[in-house]
Amino acid sequence: YKYTAFVVQDEVLKEKHGITDLDGLRRKAASIYDEMYPNDASVTDETDRRNSLNRFISYHLLNRIGNYYTLTCVDGPNSTLAINWDRNNWDIADWYETMMPHSLMKFSFPSGSAEGLYINRRGVQDRADYRGVFVPGTKVHTPEEMGGKNSAYNGIYHYIDDIVHY
């Protein structure tokens, strides 16, 4: 079985969230998921799927290989769909279940100045969608930005520019 991990580097955790250790990560996870799932806020066993840290980590994992250009149907800047799709009005997107139970992650590949792969983004190119909503999402680093090395023994990993949550 192969997996995909979306990894936030230590310096990003520190700069954006003040997280420098596991206890800081536990607190951040609790601040997100204890409010969303208040009945589970007292679950301290980190192997329990209801634990906030377990939810946080498992939301950053897919139970499949997800290469940069296969998480949406854009297989590069010159792909047929990228050229023929009305990308001025719609971003190309796809959804996947994560390892966090009952959760989805949206991947989109906008064009224009915001081009690249994003997680949980809403909008078109670098602006709001037709309903007036824009959520920038979390950018996935390209394999080239990672030095071309993102394989692991049991899957692959991608660096991302911020945490993601459900």
Over which residues does each language-model region extend?
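Mature exported/compartmentalized surface modules and terminal targeting/interaction regions
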Residues: 1-166
